[in-house]
Amino acid sequence: MRNAVSKAGIISRRRLLLFQFAG
């Protein structure tokens, strides 16, 4: 469970960074 949560957090952070770069 913790592994899945950490993975989801990393993905969300990467997505936010990508959106910032695109913006």
From Swiss-Prot:
Q: Which organism is it from?
A: Escherichia coli (strain K12)
In Swiss-Prot or TrEMBL terms, this protein is called: Protein YsaE
Induction behaviour: Expressed in both exponential and stationary phase in rich medium; expression is considerably higher during exponential phase (at protein level).
